[in-house]
UniProtKB/Swiss-Prot annotation:
This is Protein kinase C. Keywords: ATP-binding, Kinase, Metal-binding, Nucleotide-binding, Phosphoprotein, Repeat, Serine/threonine-protein kinase, Transferase, Virulence, Zinc, Zinc-finger. GO terms for cellular component: cytoplasm; cytoplasmic stress granule; cytoskeleton; nucleus; site of polarized growth. Residues 1-67, 149-226 form the REM-1 domain. The modification Phosphotyrosine is found at Y1101. ATP binds at L787, G788, K789, G790, N791, F792, G793, K794, V795, K810. It catalyses: L-seryl-[protein] + ATP = O-phospho-L-seryl-[protein] + ADP + H(+); L-threonyl-[protein] + ATP = O-phospho-L-threonyl-[protein] + ADP + H(+). Interacts with hsp90. It comes from Aspergillus fumigatus (strain ATCC MYA-4609 / CBS 101355 / FGSC A1100 / Af293) (Neosartorya fumigata). The modification Phosphothreonine is found at T1082. Residues 232-350 form the C2 domain. Residues 1041-1106 form the AGC-kinase C-terminal domain. SUPFAM superfamilies: C2 domain (Calcium/lipid-binding domain, CaLB), Cysteine-rich domain, HR1 repeat, Protein kinase-like (PK-like).
Length: 1106
């Protein structure tokens, strides 16, 4: 529909509403019945509200049409480059901050130019290059509960929500009615008269509910305006996985009155109908009000115990005859009640505090200046009357805190469907196992990581059990998974019932080439779908991954032939079965496989029964994969829309067309290159590392005059993480030229690097390697204290028996590592340590050695005795200069990680240690992810709740930008001594991250607000630091205008604070909960098999500088 037709359509809707208002006004004048007048007044009110909404849409359409017809070139979005191409990402080894090759830290061009007084930094050398850079749009400040309230001003979002909800409710009610009709026929056949009458009554009620739902759906469809906007993102709020978990607790509900409902018709001489309300929780009746003829209830409180439920349903009935008639319905999600109460609690705390959101500060509220000469902390002292330095104090203006004045209740009129409203008072008390105090203090939190589920392999799919907290649709049979567990492929996200996954015989496209599959795996029905974009305004599900499609045009595709719908990113995963349902396709394939097996001998049949007949590479981890470029080939793996089922003759004909080919043997088809572990050739790996150390130095490393002098190489081979990774994955030299060598390295130089490795390996085969100087083991150390504990194990302070040097040793149980499938994660942590060791980065914790015993593995790390920043911020508030100093050093550490393809993913105060000379060291590399360059993505759900970026919570692919979000939370905590997103449990924190806007003291310096606003941008592509220049964007911000980066890197800036200890073994800067524990290794009873011990071969390591 073009612009003129759309405007004409909206105009007709407006005229229709005006005609309805005129007719309602005439009716009101012609009657004296107060009930009729009340109903007519409600219709007029709703009509005027609808006209205001439609007129607003009309203005939007007219304005957009004027821009399209008369827009100048400058009005349009400009591409990043003049030729329209995307900006070129920097090479992986591009490090302008450290080398004299491009720009020094102290170079004037690398620092922020003085004079930019606005919120947006002017002239930053690494800012967004576009003249009209995208700016995050203001987020509407409403909740899902606001949308179902009667007087909600957000009519547009409400229409979208109700279109989806009503269509789903209608489809469920139709299924329910079909089931009841079968019961009626069954009871009729059995002659059970009483049961038949009961079922017949339920069938009548279901029919009445269907009519109500159709009436409500039509009302919203008449109001909906389909405005196609390329700029508007799709609304994915209804299809958010892993977010809305079923809740347990106590629901307090009070029903006061109903108004403006269409009462059931009654005879002329009878009294009015009796009205009552039934409350259901997950289809089970939990409460019922008394019957009334006044539409009011005086004392109807209900306390309802909720046990892992998602939704409550309120249905208003009129009883004027033998059977009650439903006249109005309302559905309320329990999680929406809990979210509304959380927001009300926060609002009550902040109302009198003087803290505001960033957008309000930009309208003249914030004029604070970040004065370099000001006293540290001059603008962020705690409010008067508070004790300075306490863990709960904040910025000037009065920090929010303390308990609210009374219990938080939700009292409002809610809209009934299709007409009317109901007055409710609601509250919900969640039952929590580990309730956090709802205050502003900072406390330690452990990181969470997605558990690796048991993998069920079927036809190349790696199915894992997944608990879904929203309505899903099975890709095989097409039925719903309602808040239930299902099976989902970890690679292609194919989703189905638990009972359906054994029936899946179509292949996983992420692991195969359809064209090379054996003929017996295919059927002759290969008709591709014709997918085209469409505006999704109702409840449609993806036929592959099963999620509800988002509202809008960007992500929704529909087949113009068979009506199948899916996500745009799932279209290449849908098989070419247009016109055939997935159940029929799988039935045909099963028949073909049975015929093939019948024609083969018993021995061959038994040999192939459990195999996936496809060549494939080494198995990949089901989680946390770098984004895969799926081959653009059709795949069997999605359900078809309900279509005609092929007849038995058609299935027989398809079976008969199959001719068993003279295929090669199973062993040839199943040939997989053997996987070589890193431990099979330790001498080769060490030799390769030695060659790499001498031959793979980048020009920046060779030409940097400011680099600290490195110690001369030792006689034994130097360990290089790139070579370690290359040999562990057994990459051949041809592939290593593409993957192992640094990005942007000339091909000739890469070949020269490979050749010495091969020569060195040959030499090592002939000449026995020299004995290492010292083989470090457990008997070299005395354990003195426990420094920390976690689900990983312990970190203990130890001293060497010979030199009395102190080290921090991280101890992990092998049994725990194997049970939790963390072997590869442990090896990855070691590789990240080697990356930090490579340049002895000043702000990263270094590794001195690794060793192992029969039951444990040990990381021997440098000991940092100053404690972590969490301890110090709890002892006293950081001033502005101190927070800026720590933030600058953390930024350089993240910059180094990102330049080496590592994202950190667990940035928090607990993981930042303070040395005795006042500088920081980032520790704990357990959640780091390697091979994450610009544009690379992964999807593992992990991190510390308060620091997790929105894209992680939304189960989306994410990249390096998650570190910059966490960096923003870190700066906020250091400046304001509280978290920007908080709640009583993890779910509330996640809700806050996705919905709340961070609040700031009214006099907070503008540059501080600006950097937090840009780092805490929910759209990752718009976040500061998300571009190809990465950390340089953040370094160029006005918040760091007075920072000389070269001086920071070389520790020439005097630190603002120096921790103190009474002796080298003083552990007073660590939590007494841990240091009071006796430092002993608890006995391990289990014995690991030889195969389990093999998993840790090659783990031992000693650094050159140790």
């Amino acid at each position: 529909m073009d612009g003129d037709d759309l405007i004409a359509s909206v105009y007709r809707k407006i005229e229709r509403e005006k005609a309805l208002i005129t007719a309602a006004s005439n009716m009101r004048q012609s009657t004296d019945n107060p009930l009729v007048q009340q109903r007519v007044d409600a219709n007029i009110r709703d009509g005027r509200k609808n006209i205001a909404y439609l007129e607003e849409k009309m203005r939007e359409l007219q304005l957009r049409q004027m821009k399209q017809e008369g827009a100048s070139p400058t009005d349009k979005r400009l591409p990043p480059n003049p030729d329209g191409s995307a900006p070129v990402p920097p090479p992986k080894d591009y490090a302008p901050g450290y080398s004299g090759h491009e720009r020094e830290y102290g170079d004037a061009s690398g620092a922020y130019p003085h004079g930019g007084a606005g919120t947006m930094p002017s002239g930053a050398p690494f800012a967004d290059p576009r003249p009209f850079a995208p700016v995050p749009k203001a987020r509407p400040n409403y909740t899902k509960l606001d949308l179902i309230k009667y007087d909600t001003p957000y009519l547009g979002p409400k229409i979208q929500l109700m279109l989806s909800q009503l269509e789903f409710k209608l489809s469920v009610e139709k299924q329910y009615k079909a089931g009841i009709e079968k019961m009626v026929r069954l009871y009729q056949d059995e002659g059970d008269r009483k049961s038949r009458q009961d079922a017949e009554g339920r069938r009548i009620e279901s029919n009445q509910k269907i009519q109500l739902l159709k009436q409500a759906l039509k009302r919203y469809e008449d109001l909906h305006v389909d405005i196609e906007s390329a700029e508007a993102p799709d609304d994915e709020s209804l299809s958010t996985p892993n977010l809305r978990k079923p809740l347990t607790g106590l629901l307090t509900l009070r029903i006061h009155a109903v108004e403006d409902v269409d009462h059931a018709a009654s005879s002329r001489f009878s009294r009015g109908p009796e009205t009552f309300v039934v409350v259901k929780v997950e289809d089970a009746i939990k409460a019922r009000t008394k019957a009334t003829r006044t539409d009011k209830w005086q004392d109807e409180p209900f306390n309802i115990e909720i046990d892992k439920a998602n939704e409550i349903e309120l249905t208003v009935y009129d009883k004027s005859g033998d059977r009650p008639t439903p006249i109005g319905m309302l559905w309320v999600r329990i999680s929406d009640i809990a979210e509304e109460m959380r927001r009300k609690k926060i609002e009550s705390e902040f109302n009198a505090s003087g803290w505001v959101s960033a957008d309000k500060m930009e309208h003249g509220a914030a004029h604070g200046r970040q004065d370099a000469g000001g006293a540290p902390g001059s603008s962020n002292r705690p409010p008067s009357g508070g004790h300075s330095g306490g863990p709960g104090q904040g910025y000037a203006g009065g920090a929010p805190g303390g308990a609210s004045a009374g219990p938080v209740l939700i009292d409002s009129w809610f809209a009934l469907e299709p007409v009317g409203r109901i007055h409710l008072t609601l509250s919900f008390a969640k039952q929590l196992k580990d309730r956090r105090p709802f205050d502003i203090g900072l406390n330690r939190q452990g990181a969470v990581r997605q558990k690796k589920e048991e993998v069920h392999e079927k036809q190349g799919h790696k199915f894992v059990t997944q608990q879904f907290y929203n309505i899903m649709r099975c890709a095989l049979c097409g039925d719903f998974l309602k808040y239930a567990a299902g099976m989902q492929c970890a690679d292609c996200k194919y989703t189905c019932h638990r009972k359906c996954y054994p029936k899946v015989v179509t292949k996983c496209i992420s692991k195969a080439n359809y064209e090379t599959d054996p003929d017996e795996e295919k059927i002759n029905h290969r008709i591709p779908h014709r997918f085209e974009g469409f505006s999704n305004i109702s409840a449609n599900w993806c036929c592959h991954c099963g999620y509800l499609l988002p509202f809008g045009r960007k992500s929704a595709k529909r087949c113009t032939e068979c009506g199948l719908t899916c996500h745009a990113q799932c279209t290449h995963l849908v098989p070419d079965f247009c016109g055939m349902s997935m159940e029929a396709a799988n039935q045909i394939l099963e028949t073909l496989i049975r015929a093939k097996n019948h024609n083969k001998s018993a021995s061959v049949s038994s040999g192939l029964s459990g195999r996936t007949l496809r060549p494939g590479g080494p198995p990949q981890a089901p989680q946390d994969n770098v984004a895969l470029a799926y081959p653009q080939k059709p795949v069997e793996g999605a359900y078809g829309a309900p279509q005609r089922q092929p007849s038995a003759e058609a299935i027989s004909a398809a079976t008969n067309t199959y001719i068993p080919p003279q295929s090669p043997t199973a062993a040839q088809r199943q040939h997989i290159p053997p996987r070589t572990s890193s431990s099979q050739s330790p001498a080769a790996a060490a030799a390769a590392a030695a060659a790499a150390a001498t031959g793979l130095r980048t020009p920046q490393q060779a030409s940097d005059p400011n680099r600290p002098v490195q110690p001369p190489p030792s006689s034994h081979a130097h360990y290089d993480p790139a070579a370690y990774a290359s040999y562990q994955q057994a990459i051949p030299p041809q592939a290593m030229q593409k993957m192992g060598a640094p990005y942007g390295m000339p091909q000739q130089q890469q070949q020269q690097a490979v050749a010495p490795m091969q020569q060195q390996v040959a030499v090592k085969e002939e000449i026995p390697p020299q004995q290492p100087k010292v083989r470090i083991g457990l008997d070299h150390f005395n354990f003195l204290a426990v420094l920390g504990k976690g689900n990983f194990g312990k970190v203990m302070l130890a001293e060497t028996k010979s030199t009395k040097k102190l080290y921090a040793i991280k101890v992990l149980k092998k049994e725990f590592i194997i049970e939790n499938d963390e072997v590869e994660s442990t090896k990855s942590e070691k590789r990240v340590f080697l990356i930090a060791n490579k340049e002895r980065h000043p702000f990263l914790l270094n590794l001195h050695a690794c060793f192992q015993t029969e039951t444990r593995v040990y990381f021997v790390m440098e000991y940092i005795s100053g404690g972590d920043l969490m301890l110090h911020i709890q002892r006293g508030q950081f001033g502005l200069k101190r927070a800026q100093f720590y933030a600058a050093e953390v930024l350089l550490a993240l910059k180094y990680f990102h330049e080496n393809g590592v994202i950190y993913r667990d940035l928090k105060l607990d993981n930042i240690l303070l040395t005795l000379d006042g500088h920081i060291k980032i520790a704990d590399y357990g959640l780091c992810k390697e091979n994450m360059w610009y544009g690379s993505t992964t999807s593992t759900f992990c991190g510390t709740p308060e620091f997790m970026a929105p894209e992680i919570l939304l189960d989306k692919k994410y990249g390096r930008a998650v570190d910059w979000w966490a960096f923003g939370v870190l700066i906020y905590q250091m400046l304001l001594q509280q978290s920007p997103f908080r709640g009583e449990d993890e779910d509330e924190i996640y809700d806050a991250i996705l919905a709340d806007e961070p609040l700031y003291p009214i006099h907070m310096p503008r540059d501080s607000v600006s950097i937090l606003q840009k780092l805490l941008t929910r759209e990752p592509e718009l976040r500061l630091g998300s571009g190809p220049t990465d950390a340089q964007e953040v370094m160029s911000h006005a918040f760091f205008r007075n920072i000389n980066w070269d001086d920071i890197y070389h520790k020439r800036v005097p630190p603002p604070f120096l921790p103190t200890i009474s002796s080298p073994t003083d552990t007073s800067n660590f939590d007494q909960e841990f240091t009071s524990v006796t430092p002993v290794l608890t006995p391990v009873q289990s014995v690991l098999s030889q195969a389990m011990q093999e998993e840790f071969r090659g783990f031992s390591y000693t650094a050159d500088f140790a």
